[in-house]
Amino acid sequence: MSSQVLASSQLSDKIIARPTTNFHPSIWGDRFLHYNVSEQDLVCKQERIEELIQVVKKEILSSNHDQLKLIDNLQRLGLSHHFESEIEKLLEQLSIGTHHQNHQDLHDASLWFRLLRQHGLNVSSSIFEKFKDDEGNFKKSLITDVSGLLSLYEASHLSYVGESILDEALAFTTTHLKSIVANSKNHPLSHQISKALERPLRMTLERLHARFYISIYEKDASHNKVLLELAKLDFNLLQCFHKKELSEIVRWWKEHEFAKKFPFARDRMVELYFWILGVYYEPKYSRARKLLTKVIALTSITDDIYDAYGTIDELQLLTKAMQRWDINCMDKLEPEYLKTYYKVMLESYEEFEKELKKEELYKLEYAKEEMKRIIRAYFEEARWLNEGYLPSFDEHLRVSYISSGYVLLIATSYVGMDDIVTHETLNWLSKDPKIVSASTLLSRFMDDIGSRKFEQERNHVLSTVECYMKQYEVSEEEAVKELNKRVANCWKEINEDFIRPTSVPFPILFRIINLTKTADFMYREGGDQYTHVGKMLKDSIAALLIDPIPL
């Protein structure tokens, strides 16, 4: 009987004029559906990793070792999750006293500054005044110090709003690093410089950089053999762990037949897992990672219903039902695909409840309210499109700030985490602190800049780009330039709100930093990597989830 109803619904859908969009199907097929690995092999790897960790811990405690370089290598190689307390203690020691006064070398001074700032320690950028000449410009002699330039370039991305010396440092280093890449392709640092110019460390996904840096580190004649072995083994072990996790999520997607039930929606389960892997990769966050991946998958379907398939009358019914969040509302929904969606959404959140302890359920309730809020925003945008209404930039942003999805993702990222997330955490989040608003605005602007060409080709609500053009009477090029300036400013506000003492524990803030990095990755290249899966995203997924590092 249900199949007859569905068939009837599908027939009526063909008659209804829908704003359909043809998204390409999943490029992965069933590649990640099954996971096979030798458990004995994993045990052997884990035992060797534990041995190497103890060796490295002794090196960290050694006072005669180059501690800055060691910390930097641990982070770049993707190993810092094993040494969080040791690194924390070392950096606090390095932040006090006269350590910075000993750094007359540009590379070391910049490294000291970057490592401390990215751990929330408020060190002054005045340390770089010593590298300026009498006229207030960076010394010309620095141009030949390539490693120093690269280190200063990376440090400059930890700047605050109005920190002019770091703005000058960024302009100075960018100019000369580009020249080095163009004119000295055989320079030993050429590859690292190109990568940094493409995406600086502050904006880079940790696991992707670890994969890249392991290959660079191995070629360094002075590399630490223990660190290199540990980095390779740890990367491959985590890859196995992530592949197993992904297979569970893909099976969940397949068993619920999402692609079949919602053929108009993007089928991007693998890409979504990769996205959330950028938020947290550590094994201890497995539960949180799986839950967040499922929620972003449901949100993607919701987005496509509102943005690419549903009629305004259908969306109005669905919006009202979602605000009530009551299975009894399902009977009032038509056509059949809305009933299916509603049932799937409510049942999925019931599944999530079962995965949580009773005392954790308040976190899911908070996240559920954010889901309701994003649905209201989706409907408001659909109403604008239906009425042909062109909002002002400010009016658009009040709605699209929510529809960006990042407030929902931040809230949901905390649901599966441990006791570090408390009622106070969610109270802090509800006040929309600067780090949250900056991250959300950044993702909104980068999404709109990256997806605008595709959206202009179909009947779609106007983005912040078009609304900015209208309100300020400027060209598209000028609007994009201005929004990119705002993106850069958002990073500075994020840096400012990351400084200790913070209102919430650092693991809470790191989720926001990492979510911001995922937005940068998905939209920076002037396109929407999620909707249109290209070579960059495909290669990145292969690097993290298919190809192990040769030992």
Swiss-Prot record:
Reaction(s) catalysed by this chain's protein: (2E,6E)-farnesyl diphosphate = delta-selinene + diphosphate; (2E)-geranyl diphosphate = beta-myrcene + diphosphate; (2E)-geranyl diphosphate = (4S)-limonene + diphosphate; (2E,6E)-farnesyl diphosphate + H2O = selina-6-en-4-ol + diphosphate
Provide the binding site for Mg(2+) 1: D303, D307
Give the cofactor note. Binds 3 Mg(2+) or Mn(2+) ions per subunit.
Q: Which domain of life is it from?
A: Eukaryota
Residues that bind Mg(2+) 2:
D303, D307
GO MF term set? magnesium ion binding; terpene synthase activity
Keyword Nucleotidyltransferase tagged:
no
E.C. number, please? 4.2.3.-, 4.2.3.16, 4.2.3.15
Q: Which cofactor does it need?
A: Mg(2+); Mn(2+)
Renumbered ranges of motif DDXXD motif:
303-307
Q: Which Pfam families match?
A: Terpene_synth, Terpene_synth_C
Q: What class of enzyme is it?
A: lyase
Per the UniProt entry, what are the Gene Ontology biological process annotations, in alphabetical order? diterpenoid biosynthetic process
Residues that hold Mg(2+) 3 according to the record: D447, S451, E455
Keywords, A to Z, come to: Lyase, Magnesium, Metal-binding
Q: What is known of its domains?
A: The Asp-Asp-Xaa-Xaa-Asp/Glu (DDXXD/E) motif is important for the catalytic activity, presumably through binding to Mg(2+).
Query: What's the family?
Result: Belongs to the terpene synthase family. Tpsb subfamily.
Protein name in the entry: Delta-selinene synthase TPS7FN
Cite the source lineage. Answer: Eukaryota, Viridiplantae, Streptophyta, Embryophyta, Tracheophyta
The protein's gene is named TPS7FN
